[in-house]
Amino acid sequence: MKFLVDIHAHTIASTHAYSTFHDYLGVAKAKGIKLFAITDHGPDMADAPHFWHFVNMRVLPRIVDGVGVLRGIEANIKNEHGEIDFFGDYLKELDIVLAGFHEPVFPPSTKEAHTTALINSIESGNVDIITHPGNPAYPIDVKRVASAAAKHNVALEINNSSFLTSRKGSTCNCIEIANAVKAAGGLLVMGSDSHVAFSLGEFEKAIEVIETVGFPIERLLNRSPEALLSFLTARGHKSLDEYSALID
């Protein structure tokens, strides 16, 4: 099966990434990607875009040359309370909210601290998807996190970049996470975590994890634009007519 939805991509607004919005559109069109999200790092990261970047995402068109674009953020989980670096009514203006641990904002601590932070972030209602929860720098109680995510309709990401250029040692953790989410009845989503447009929609290693555990395709949000958009609507985001052309 070809997966034509990607929820995790960074532009040059995060200055350790190397592609523009237009670069991503060109690659998406060439690869036949139907829907992707621009999710630059939240403002507490040292080289992240200014807060206004996210406020002004309203200027981005939702459909360009047949490709759907989601306005999003990869927020930083800041502390054990699960707080993130984007807040209030501004969150409601975004189409998708990812959040995860990043060393400059939340330095690695203990397994219990990481688990508490993730569960509190999940329970806050502010986060749709937890990014790279398999990061070996942040050990977690996988069953507790998977159970909380399933209960609160939050998806956990299998991050393809973790197997390639960062967070080496994630494979066993991601297999454990996928098995736990499967058992809990929860949702997974694959993210390329692209920092250059060429990797948009590339999920080869993440797919291996999905196939290894026999994860049910009907609970994988990348399976179609409709699956992801329905999930986001169920999470309280606006249902937008502009995306109707993406639904088969």
UniProtKB/Swiss-Prot annotation:
Record's keyword annotation contains Hydrolase: yes
Cofactor remark from the record: Binds 3 Zn(2+) ions per subunit.
Cofactor(s) recorded in Swiss-Prot or TrEMBL: Zn(2+)
Residues reported to bind Zn(2+) 2: 16, 41, 195
GO molecular function terms attached to this record: phosphatase activity; zinc ion binding
Family: Belongs to the PHP family.
PANTHER family linked to this entry: PHOSPHATASE YCDX-RELATED
Keywords in alphabetical order: Hydrolase, Metal-binding, Zinc
GO BP of this protein: bacterial-type flagellum-dependent swarming motility
Binding site for Zn(2+) 1: 8, 10, 74, 193
Name of the protein in its database record: Probable phosphatase Sfri_3709
Membrane-spanning intervals of the chain: none
Gene3D superfamilies assigned: Metal-dependent hydrolases
A Gene Ontology term for the protein's cellular component: cytosol
Binding site for Zn(2+) 3: 74, 102, 132
SUPFAM superfamilies: PHP domain-like
Pfam families: PHP
